[in-house]
């Protein structure tokens, strides 16, 4: 479902106060554009989610410390994703579409983490 703004009706009289089709119409309830800065806002627009990489299942992942074990944190991430997926199984059986979508995203995320764990295991086996 896509949103298309409704253009204002063209004015038939040349001197009327109604703006023409090319003129932007400011309204009291208009939504600010995410591309520019909004007057009174603290800073530029920042989305609340990240479209890059696997989904986070609604929790924020901690940054890895410089000396942290890569495989240990990947493995713990995988365990937490599996735990989150377990919470979505019963609502999915009950017919919840949102739980089904979260479960799908969790499966995709878990598969990516399993690939990372396997790659790490192979790297460790070579050394």
UniProtKB/Swiss-Prot annotation:
<dbReference type="GO" id="GO:0005874">
    <property type="term" value="C:microtubule"/>
</dbReference>
<feature type="region of interest" description="Interaction with CDK2">
    <location>
        <begin position="65"/>
        <end position="107"/>
    </location>
</feature>
<dbReference type="GO" id="GO:2000035">
    <property type="term" value="P:regulation of stem cell division"/>
</dbReference>
<dbReference type="GO" id="GO:2000134">
    <property type="term" value="P:negative regulation of G1/S transition of mitotic cell cycle"/>
</dbReference>
<keyword id="KW-0597">Phosphoprotein</keyword>
<dbReference type="GO" id="GO:0070507">
    <property type="term" value="P:regulation of microtubule cytoskeleton organization"/>
</dbReference>
<keyword id="KW-0539">Nucleus</keyword>
<dbReference type="GO" id="GO:0005737">
    <property type="term" value="C:cytoplasm"/>
</dbReference>
<comment type="subunit">
    <text>Component of the nucleosome remodeling and deacetylase (NuRD) repressor complex, composed of core proteins MTA1, MTA2, MTA3, RBBP4, RBBP7, HDAC1, HDAC2, MBD2, MBD3, and peripherally associated proteins CDK2AP1, CDK2AP2, GATAD2A, GATAD2B, CHD3, CHD4 and CHD5. The exact stoichiometry of the NuRD complex is unknown, and some subunits such as MBD2 and MBD3, GATAD2A and GATAD2B, and CHD3, CHD4 and CHD5 define mutually exclusive NuRD complexes. Interacts with CDK2AP1. Interacts with CDK2. Interacts with MAPK1.</text>
</comment>
<dbReference type="Pfam" id="PF09806">
    <property type="entry name" value="CDK2AP"/>
</dbReference>
<feature type="region of interest" description="Disordered">
    <location>
        <begin position="1"/>
        <end position="49"/>
    </location>
</feature>
<comment type="similarity">
    <text>Belongs to the CDK2AP family.</text>
</comment>
<comment type="function">
    <text>Acts as a component of the histone deacetylase NuRD complex which participates in the remodeling of chromatin. Inhibits cell cycle G1/S phase transition by repressing CDK2 expression and activation; represses CDK2 activation by inhibiting its interaction with cyclin E and A. Plays a role in regulating the self-renewal of embryonic stem cells (ESCs) and in maintaining cell survival during terminal differentiation of ESCs. Regulates microtubule organization of metaphase II oocytes.</text>
</comment>
<keyword id="KW-0963">Cytoplasm</keyword>
<feature type="compositionally biased region" description="Low complexity">
    <location>
        <begin position="9"/>
        <end position="44"/>
    </location>
</feature>
<dbReference type="GO" id="GO:0005634">
    <property type="term" value="C:nucleus"/>
</dbReference>
<protein>
    <recommendedName>
        <fullName>Cyclin-dependent kinase 2-associated protein 2</fullName>
    </recommendedName>
</protein>
<dbReference type="GO" id="GO:0016581">
    <property type="term" value="C:NuRD complex"/>
</dbReference>
<dbReference type="InterPro" id="IPR017266">
    <property type="entry name" value="DOC_1/2"/>
</dbReference>
């Amino acid at each position: 479902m896509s949103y298309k703004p409704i253009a204002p009706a063209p004015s038939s009289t040349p001197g009327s106060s109604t703006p023409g089709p090319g003129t932007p119409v400011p309204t009291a309830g208009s939504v600010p554009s995410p591309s520019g800065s909004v007057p009174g806002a603290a800073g530029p627009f920042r989305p609340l989610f990240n479209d890059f990489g696997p989904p986070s299942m609604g929790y924020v992942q901690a940054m890895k410390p410089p000396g942290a074990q890569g495989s240990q944190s990947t493995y713990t991430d995988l365990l937490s994703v599996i735990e989150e997926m377990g919470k979505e199984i019963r609502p999915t059986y009950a017919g919840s579409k949102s739980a089904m979508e979260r479960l799908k995203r969790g499966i995709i995320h878990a598969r990516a983490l399993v690939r990372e764990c396997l790659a790490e295991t192979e790297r460790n086996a070579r050394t």
